[in-house]
Amino acid sequence: MTADLLLTHFNQVFCPNDLGHPLFGAEMKEARVLEDGYIAVKDGKILAVGSGEPDASLIGPDTKIQSYEGKIATPGLIDCHTHLVYGGSREHEFAKKLAGVPYLEILAQGGGILSTVRATREASFENLYDKSKKLLDYMLLHGVTTVEAKSGYGLNWETEKRQLDVVGALDRDHEIDLVSTFMAAHAVPPEYKGRSQEYLELIVEEMLPRVKEENLAEFCDIFCEKGVFTADESRYLLSKAKEMGFKLRIHADEIESIGGVDVAAELGATSAEHLMMATDEGIRKMAEAKVIGNLLPATTFSLMEDTYAPARKMLEAGMAITLTTDSNPGSCPTANLQFVMQLGCFMMRLTPVEVLNAVTINAAYSVNRQDKIGSFDTGKQADITILDAKNIDYPLYFFATNLTHQVYKAGKLVVDQGRIV
């Protein structure tokens, strides 16, 4: 079979192993790295990858051939935890952060998430759409081709639905594919202060059924943290969501360890998020339950904390992990996944291969798109990120610079040398 598109002579092509499950523990150390590699694409899907001169059978009279000496290729990068859609911004809290005021104290003062809730409730669909599109454009220019996006800045049905409608519209309109997560349990809204269980009952009885009926989200998430929702409250919400057919996520062990990872393990959550304060016992439980750890080192960086999620302990225990931005207006105002990848090396001591596996094949499993993206297996969508680097180590070593040369989405060139095309 001849290719429509043949990308040749890469210095290296990074090929994650899709073993039929996320890469656990030591499996994350392994990948195929093709020297003088090529990628053949047919009808927007991967036809073949290899080293050296492509087989003549791949080349027909209409095959477009492009050479990439001095470049590397990876599967399209996947940002599997973001709070993409929101109103306003929170630079007015930056001075407090610099002065050492803790995140939960800012929240208790009516700032933090609640500040963004007020701005998001006031924002129109058009305003939220335009703001989120700009973030997606930035992500695409940095090599990202799939993004998970949560609601959670409405905390009422009208605004939560507006956020999810924006995600759905952008999924249709933008080159980046989006995966929706419903997270009305991001905080207790001011009108339910002191009545968190009553608010969760509202979510369970009124919001979740409508989200499912209107097919607005695939995942359900909750913030299990001191001063927000307890482990028992998280168990209540997520068990009800599971009964309705949602896949589960949980923000856990970010600031204190209060049992969120136990809930993740008990309910078979797809992933647990943050995990900076994860204990050895919690890590063991997640490993046994095959819960993916979505790690967000840029949040630790932004909060100016010293404790990063114990990635090496997790791998030694046999967990699967990802790296992702947590892009949001407060605790992590960035949309640069390449920077997050570099933090994975510099602050978590992950190797380049482990990092690249974390943002490709494991991230694909985290968003339930492993059959479509995350590796260069034949038949998967031809999402390809091309970096201006001579080997796979270089973009992790040469930090704080966007090295994206080109991006292909389903075999279509969508980024070319700093421009969206």
From Swiss-Prot:
Its cofactor is Zn(2+); Fe(3+). The keyword 4Fe-4S does not apply. Fe(3+) binds at residues 81, 83, 251, 326. It comes from Streptococcus gordonii (strain Challis / ATCC 35105 / BCRC 15272 / CH1 / DL1 / V288). This is Imidazolonepropionase. The keyword Hydrolase applies. It holds the Pfam family Amidohydro_1. It catalyses: 4-imidazolone-5-propanoate + H2O = N-formimidoyl-L-glutamate. Its EC number is 3.5.2.7. Disulfide bonds: none annotated.
